[in-house]
From Swiss-Prot:
Protein name (record): Glutaminase
Top-rank EC class of the record's enzyme: hydrolase
Catalytic activity as recorded in UniProt: L-glutamine + H2O = L-glutamate + NH4(+)
Taxonomic source organism: Shewanella baltica (strain OS155 / ATCC BAA-1091)
Subunit structure: Homotetramer.
Classification via Gene3D superfamilies: DD-peptidase/beta-lactamase superfamily (3.40.710.10)
Single Gene Ontology MF annotation: glutaminase activity
EC number(s) per entry: 3.5.1.2
Amino acids binding substrate: S63, N114, E158, N165, Y189, Y240, V258
Annotated InterPro entries: Beta-lactam/transpept-like, Glutaminase
Keywords: Hydrolase
């Protein structure tokens, strides 16, 4: 376990970067977040959690939720049913690209871009009676925090600005790769993105990725092989168009969200969550990436 002093050092080391990025402003509920917040939490495979900075401050997890939705799908479907509808390759286009969906005849490149996550949400909608409730149940169980909830204001705000995601869904439907009612699936998807959690919650919830598929309670969520495969996808496609830069600087599987959070994993050791709302040009937390880079250097850890 890293010492608390190291986590505090990491936060203070990157604090001067605050002010150099840009808070997501495509929906008002995200634009109003305090840009000066910064936090980090780590959870070890022994179940111990440490944090520094604003690590107990809840934020909108946004695309980090795509890890949970894919994990949930893996517990409900045969793998062939999932991967026949969504690929495993890095995108190379923006995360909300329509062009790529058209070129690839409705099959999204990976489950971590919007098109791929919408297909996963479509799969969950068709298999679960109450997909929003099931997701809430899962993240509360994984984080050991029954106060985790959806931010209704964020979900509603996303829905009011949903034209592009609706276009992606309808385009996939035209290719036969979207089964459900678009409006219903969009509402479910936006609720997933509107989950509100803090760094401690997320570092605990993602521990299964560091612990061979076993959650913080020791329950097996997905198999050891599935965990390894999921980490591989996170390493290649988890950071929008910044996955290569992140692998170079940080060297860990990770997933970011435009709320400023990033989760990362050192397999066999620990899961990490950092948060700072200001983003770089790829939509990844600027100070968050720097915190993870500094931590990986100080710990001497990389998967490469």
């Amino acid at each position: 376990m890293p010492e608390l002093a190291l986590l505090e050092e990491v936060v203070e080391k990157v604090r001067p970067l605050l002010g150099q990025g840009k808070v997501a402003d495509y929906i008002p509920a995200l634009a109003s977040v305090d840009a000066g917040k910064i936090g980090i939490a780590v959870t070890t495979v022994d179940g111990e959690t440490l944090g520094a900075g604003d690590y107990l401050e809840p934020f909108s997890i946004q695309s980090i939720s795509k890890v949970f939705s894919l994990t949930l799908a893996l517990t409900l479907y045969e793998e062939a049913e999932i991967w026949s509808r969504v690929g495993k390759e890095p995108s190379g286009h923006s995360f909300n690209s329509l062009v790529q969906v058209e070129l690839e005849r409705g099959k999204p490149r990976n489950p971590f871009i919007n098109a791929g996550a919408l297909v996963i949400a479509d799969l969950l909608q068709s298999r679960l009676g109450a997909p929003k409730h099931r997701m809430l149940e899962l993240v509360r169980q994984l984080s050991q925090n029954d106060k985790v909830c959806f931010d209704k204001q964020v979900a509603d705000s996303e829905y009011q600005h949903s034209a592009r995601n609706a276009a992606i869904a309808y385009l996939m439907k035209s290719f036969g790769n979207f089964q459900g009612d678009v409006d219903t699936v969009l509402r479910t998807y936006f609720h997933y993105c509107a989950l509100k959690m803090n760094c401690a919650d997320l570092s605990k919830a993602m521990l299964y990725l560091a612990n061979r598929g076993k959650s913080i309670t020791g329950t097996e969520l997905i198999s050891q092989v599935q965990t390894r495969q999921l980490n591989a996808l996170l390493a290649t496609s988890g950071l929008y168009d910044g996955a290569g830069e992140f692998a170079y600087r940080v060297g860990m599987p990770g997933k970011s969200g435009v709320g400023g959070g990033i989760i990362a994993v050192i397999p066999g050791e620990l899961s990490i969550c950092v948060w700072s709302p200001e983003l770089d040009g790829n939509g990844n937390s600027l100070a968050g990436t720097a915190m993870l880079e500094h931590l990986s250097q100080r710990l001497g850890r990389s998967i490469f």
